[in-house]
């Protein structure tokens, strides 16, 4: 069995292709700090600005922030109750195996009787691993707030211009 950061990981199987990413249609994977080369404010800010990462939080005690893949159409800072992963494409995940969050790599396909995937890297464990970087995450929350990525801002301005032109 392969491991990443001491957690068992499972590459996508034919079973994943059959179900067309049901897990990805409901809950994007969470990133471990080990998924990033640069954990500084600027390094993580640059990754988040690409538009595929959200800052989420764990509500139970002790509380804490962590990073995960964004849902389609959601803000950068967003408490998740589920949604479609931005990385889900008709053929499966558009990220290479190396680019995927540990929360995705740790999913064992069809682990239980309901055919659901089960992960070896929980959100609670993820949140605990991000604790060391809580100051950086808090600065990112303050920076992004309800902001959109530069791409989303540009697209919004283009839509506004098209609406104005169509009047």
Q: What does each model-found stretch correspond to?
A:
Residues 1-167:
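Short loop/turn segments that flank or connect secondary-structure elements
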């Amino acid at each position: 069995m392969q491991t990443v950061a001491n957690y068992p990981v499972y590459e996508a199987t034919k079973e994943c292709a059959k179900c067309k990413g049901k897990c990805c249609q409901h809950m994007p994977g969470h990133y471990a700090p080990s998924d990033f080369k640069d954990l500084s404010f600027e390094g993580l800010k640059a990754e988040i600005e690409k538009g595929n990462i959200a800052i989420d939080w764990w509500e139970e005690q002790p509380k804490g922030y962590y990073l995960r893949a964004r849902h389609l159409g959601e803000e950068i800072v967003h408490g998740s109750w589920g949604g479609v992963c931005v990385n889900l494409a008709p053929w499966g995940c558009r990220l290479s195996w190396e680019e995927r969050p540990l929360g995705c790599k740790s999913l064992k396909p069809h682990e239980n009787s309901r055919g659901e995937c089960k992960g070896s890297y929980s959100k609670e464990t993820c949140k605990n691993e991000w604790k060391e970087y809580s100051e950086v995450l808090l600065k990112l929350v303050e920076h992004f707030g309800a902001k959109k990525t530069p791409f989303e801002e540009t697209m919004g301005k283009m839509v506004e211009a098209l609406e104005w032109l169509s009047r």
